[in-house]
């Protein structure tokens, strides 16, 4: 079965391209184009009244889509920003005792990695990093470090961006979280709409950040945060949008909304939310769930992994697969991460052949998604065999 018709505009721009970077810059479905146009039309139709519409209709719809996807009991625990870095800054600003004691890993995405390093340099944070390797013991080691205490904020990825390895200790970390600390922040960028994610049991204790750029098929500008009630109630870095609505706090001081709106910034571009809502409506109309899309991607990646193991992809078969496909139906990334000294060169040769992947250091990543078919994977295998 093919779903290419849902992506007709994007695919028509380069019909011969093989795009296996769905985990990086996912192609946008036609529904996102319709959302983009709707945003323009409504902005110009309603002009100054646009914001009434955005906050009455567009934002609540997006909140409901995310709450449904993640099993959140209250849509108003969701707030939006152009990117997840904005939320990291605001959450950490709310911990006013410095230096902030951070527990994290050596595998976090650059937005947090770089910021944490700079906080260390400035004396604003003391950072403890737990190694991902050996990953077989990661959950046990990271949980033990968290249970050891002495940390104000714990930051960890649901699925690690470079290796595609997924953690299994979110419940254990959530059990430690308290409004007075530690706060637990889960980076869900490679989990949201990539693998079925149910946060209903931990929604009252963890922060969860993600966005629309990857598996939500929405593009840039649609970062979001789930913020549990009672945690970080007065972030120091705060925008003027955070003072709209039902406010709380000392009458003589700066007041905040009680819901996730306490993390609003200032004037933002609402168009990405139009795209996101359009994509989610499309999925509902097509009867496609994250479980369905994940299963489709798993079938494609399993065939590619089989070809690698059988030597059908030339020298690519010499790479170490960091996130091999298991038979336990455990949450997993929507890409295969292959570690090899030639990863950069392989990616360049594939790009010259109009095959798009991406590379992180010595790891080349092949991402699978809704707009690919079994025939596309066979073409990919044939190209790899010819090139390598």
What are these model-predicted stretches?
Residues 1-388:
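Pyridoxal 5′-phosphate
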């Amino acid at each position: 079965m093919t779903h290419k018709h849902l992506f007709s505009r994007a695919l028509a721009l380069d019909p011969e391209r093989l795009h296996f970077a769905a985990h990086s810059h996912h192609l946008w479905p036609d529904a996102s184009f319709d959302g983009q146009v709707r945003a323009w039309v409504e902005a110009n139709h309603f002009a100054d009244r646009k914001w009434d519409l955005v906050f009455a209709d567009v934002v609540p719809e997006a909140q409901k889509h995310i709450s449904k996807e993640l099993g959140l009991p209250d849509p108003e625990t969701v707030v939006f920003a152009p990117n997840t870095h904005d939320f990291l800054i605001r959450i950490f600003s709310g911990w006013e005792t410095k230096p902030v004691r951070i527990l994290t890993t050596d595998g976090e995405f650059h937005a947090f990695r770089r910021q944490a390093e700079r906080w260390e340099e400035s004396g604003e944070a003391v950072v403890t990093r737990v190694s991902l390797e050996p990953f077989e013991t990661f959950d046990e080691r990271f949980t033990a470090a968290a249970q050891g205490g002495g940390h104000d904020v714990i930051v960890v990825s649901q699925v690690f961006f470079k290796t595609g390895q997924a953690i299994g200790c979110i419940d254990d970390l959530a059990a430690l979280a308290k409004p007075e600390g530690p706060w637990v922040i889960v980076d869900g960028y490679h989990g949201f709409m990539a693998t079925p994610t149910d946060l209903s049991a931990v929604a009252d204790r963890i922060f969860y950040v993600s966005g629309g750029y990857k598996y939500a098929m929405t593009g840039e500008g649609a970062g979001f945060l789930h913020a549990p009630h009672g945690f970080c109630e007065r972030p120091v870095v705060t925008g003027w949008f955070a003072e709209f609505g039902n406010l709380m706090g000392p009458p003589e001081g700066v007041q905040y909304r009680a819901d996730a709106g306490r993390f609003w910034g200032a004037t933002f571009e609402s168009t990405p939310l139009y795209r996101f809502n359009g994509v989610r409506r499309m999925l509902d109309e097509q009867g496609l769930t994250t479980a369905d899309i994940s299963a489709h991607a798993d079938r494609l990646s399993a065939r590619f992994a089989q070809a690698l193991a059988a030597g059908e992809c030339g020298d690519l078969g010499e790479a170490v697969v960091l996130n091999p496909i298991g038979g336990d139906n455990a949450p997993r990334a929507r890409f295969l991460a292959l570690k090899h000294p030639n990863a950069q060169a392989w990616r360049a040769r594939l790009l010259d052949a109009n095959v798009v992947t991406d590379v992180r250091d010595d790891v080349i990543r092949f991402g699978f998604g809704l707009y690919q078919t079994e025939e596309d994977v066979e073409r990919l295998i044939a190209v790899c065999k010819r090139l390598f």
